[in-house]
Amino acid sequence: MEIKITSDRANPLLHRREVKFIANYDGTTPSVNEIKMKITAMLNADKSLTIVDSICQEYGNTESLGYVKIYDDEKSMNLFEKKSVLEKNKIEEAETTEEDGE
C-alpha cells in the first residue's frame, strides 16, 4: 500500500493536525487500522492520539481518499470527537495488541 499526503495543516483552535491523503493499493481495501499504522509511521505521530475520520472509495477502484486527525493531547481528542468514533479507533488498537501478542 502506498499513501500520498495531499494536505497537512495545523488547526490550533481544535488542538489537532488535519491530514488528507490518497491511498493506492492492490487487492482488498486496507482496514482503518492499516491506514492508521501507516500514517502514524509516516508522520511520526502517536497512534493513541490519531483518529481515522473517513476513508472513501469508489467501487472497483484501487484508490481511496482519506482524512485523519492527529490531536495534541487526549483531553482535546475526548472533547471534540464523538464517543462512537473514539470507540471504533480504540477497538482497532485492541485488535492490533491481540494480534501482536499471538
Curated annotation (Swiss-Prot):
GO terms for molecular function: structural constituent of ribosome. PROSITE patterns: RIBOSOMAL_S24E. The lineage of its organism: Archaea, Methanobacteriati, Methanobacteriota, Methanomada group, Methanococci. This is Small ribosomal subunit protein eS24. It comes from the Archaea. GO terms for biological process: translation. Belongs to the eukaryotic ribosomal protein eS24 family. The keyword Ribosomal protein applies. Signal peptide: none annotated. Keywords: Ribonucleoprotein, Ribosomal protein.
